[in-house]
Amino acid sequence: MFIAVVGLSHRTAPVEIRERLSIPEAEVGERIQQLRAHPHIEEAAILSTCNRLEVYIVTPEMESGVRQTMQFLAEAKGIPLPQLRPHLFTLLYQDAVTHLMRVAAGLDSLVLGEGQILSQVKKAQQLGQACNGMDRILNRLFKAAITAGKRIRTETGIGTGAMSISSAAVELALQEQGSLSQGKVTVVGAGKMARLLVQHLLAKGAVDITVVNRSLERAEALAKQFEQPIQVLPWESLLSSIAESNLVFTSTGATQPILTYEQLAGVLQPDQPLLLVDISVPRNIDPGVEKLRGVQVFNVDHLSRIVEENRAQRQKLALAAEALVEEEVEQFMEWWRSLETVPTISSLRHKVESIREQEMEKALSRLGKDFAEKHLEVIEALTRGIVNKILHDPMVQLRAQRDIEARRRAMQILQELFNLDPMPFQAQQER
C-alpha cells in the first residue's frame, strides 16, 4: 500500500480556482464515497478549507490511484483536467506524511503558525471516519498529524503573537492595560476591521463593548453577529461614549480625522486616562490629540511594527517546529514500515494456533467425556498463554527492527524455518 496526497492551496492556485474546488462539509462524505468507488483507492480523506483542498489516499497502485484522484477532482467540479493540472500538487510516500504534519502545525499556512488549521484537520478526520473513508493507515496518519500539531504549538509557542492589525491592536491594549474585563471599550466603525476588533476583544475578555457608527443599522447588524451583548449607539453619542471609556478603537473610512484635540478636550476630565488605538488609513485621530495629558495614541505604524516583530519571531520558531515535525514523521514511518511484518507475524500466529488447537483436540479425546468443563477452560488459557509467551519476543523484535534489510532477512528466515506462506503485502518505502 502507498500513501499520497493530491491537492491545491494558496501556494499553487488563485482564489478563483480554490473557490470552484471547495467542498462544503455537507458534501465531504458523499465525495469520499465517490473516491472509494474507484478500484485503486482503498482509503480516502478530504481536507477542505478556504486556502486549500487536499485529498489523501491509500492505494495499492500509486500511479493509478493518483490518476483517479486527479480525475475525481476535475469531474467533481466540472473543470477540464488539462486546465486544472497546473494548479495541482502531488506528494508521495514520506513526503505526503511530512506535508500533513506541517499543515497541522500551521507551517504551510498563509499566516505562519495559525491555529485554526489544526481544528480543520481534526474535522477532516472526523468526517472521514463518519463515512468509513478512513481505515487503519489514514486514521493513524491523521492522529499522528494532530499530535504533531499540538506538540509543536505547545513546545515552540509558534501560534502566539498577533499577526494582523486588528489582533495587534487588541494585544497592544491588553499589554498597556493589563486587563480588558474592567472598564468600557468603544469601537468606532462597523466594517470588517471593526468586526474583527470586537471578535478579538471578546476573545481577550472584554465584557463592556459599545459600537458607534454613522449608520446605526450597520452597527446593529455587526452586534447581532455575536452572542455576547454589544451596545450600539448613534453617531451623535460618539463623544459621550468616549468620555465614559478607558479604551477606544477607531476603524472608519473617513478621509479626515474624526477626533481632534478640541473635541476630546471638551469632554474628558483633566488627566483622564484614555488609550486610543487608530487602525484606520487615513488616520481617524488627529496627531494633536497626543498633547492631552493622560491620553495615549497608537496608530497603524505602531501596530505594523508589532506584527512584523511577531512574524520574524514566528520565522525563528518555525525552524524548531520543523525539527519536531521530522521527529513525528520518523515515528509514523517506523510504524508504517513495521506493517511489512504483519503478514509474516499473522501467518506464524495462525500456524502456531492451528497446532495448539490440533493438540488440544488430541488431548481432549484421550481424556474422555467425563473431563470437567472448568478444567477445559484452564487448559485453554494455559496453552494460549504458552503460545503468546513464545511468540511475544520474536514479534516485538521483528517489528522494532529499523534496518529494512535486516528485518526482511529475519522475515525470510521465519518463513523458511516455519514453512510459512504469508499473504503478499507491499510495504511503503522511504522514497
UniProtKB/Swiss-Prot annotation:
Reaction(s) the record says it catalyses? (S)-4-amino-5-oxopentanoate + tRNA(Glu) + NADP(+) = L-glutamyl-tRNA(Glu) + NADPH + H(+)
Q: Where is this site: Important for activity?
A: H99
Cite the GO molecular-function annotations of the record: glutamyl-tRNA reductase activity; NADP binding
HAMAP family cross-referenced by the UniProt entry: Glu_tRNA_reductase (MF_00087)
Cite the EC number.
Answer: 1.2.1.70
Cystine residue pairs: none
Record-annotated residues binding NADP(+)?
Answer: G189, A190, G191, K192, M193, A194
Q: What is this protein called?
A: Glutamyl-tRNA reductase
Subunit arrangement?
Homodimer.
| Alphabetized Pfam families for the sequence | GlutR_dimer, GlutR_N, Shikimate_DH
Q: In which pathway does it act?
A: Porphyrin-containing compound metabolism; protoporphyrin-IX biosynthesis; 5-aminolevulinate from L-glutamyl-tRNA(Glu): step 1/2; Porphyrin-containing compound metabolism; chlorophyll biosynthesis
Q: Where does substrate bind?
A: T49, C50, N51, R52, S109, E114, G115, Q116, Q120
Per the UniProt record, the source organism is Synechococcus sp. (strain JA-3-3Ab) (Cyanobacteria bacterium Yellowstone A-Prime)
Record remark on domains: Possesses an unusual extended V-shaped dimeric structure with each monomer consisting of three distinct domains arranged along a curved 'spinal' alpha-helix. The N-terminal catalytic domain specifically recognizes the glutamate moiety of the substrate. The second domain is the NADPH-binding domain, and the third C-terminal domain is responsible for dimerization.
Q: Which SUPFAM superfamilies match?
A: Glutamyl tRNA-reductase catalytic, N-terminal domain, Glutamyl tRNA-reductase dimerization domain, NAD(P)-binding Rossmann-fold domains
- Report further notes: During catalysis, the active site Cys acts as a nucleophile attacking the alpha-carbonyl group of tRNA-bound glutamate with the formation of a thioester intermediate between enzyme and glutamate, and the concomitant release of tRNA(Glu). The thioester intermediate is finally reduced by direct hydride transfer from NADPH, to form the product GSA.
User: What does this protein do, in the record's words?
Assistant: Catalyzes the NADPH-dependent reduction of glutamyl-tRNA(Glu) to glutamate 1-semialdehyde (GSA).
NCBIfam families listed in its UniProt record: hemA (TIGR01035), PRK00045.1-3 (NF000744)
* GO terms classed as biological process: chlorophyll biosynthetic process; protoporphyrinogen IX biosynthetic process
**Keyword Transport set for record:** no
Enzyme kind, highest EC tier: oxidoreductase
The UniProt similarity line reads: Belongs to the glutamyl-tRNA reductase family.
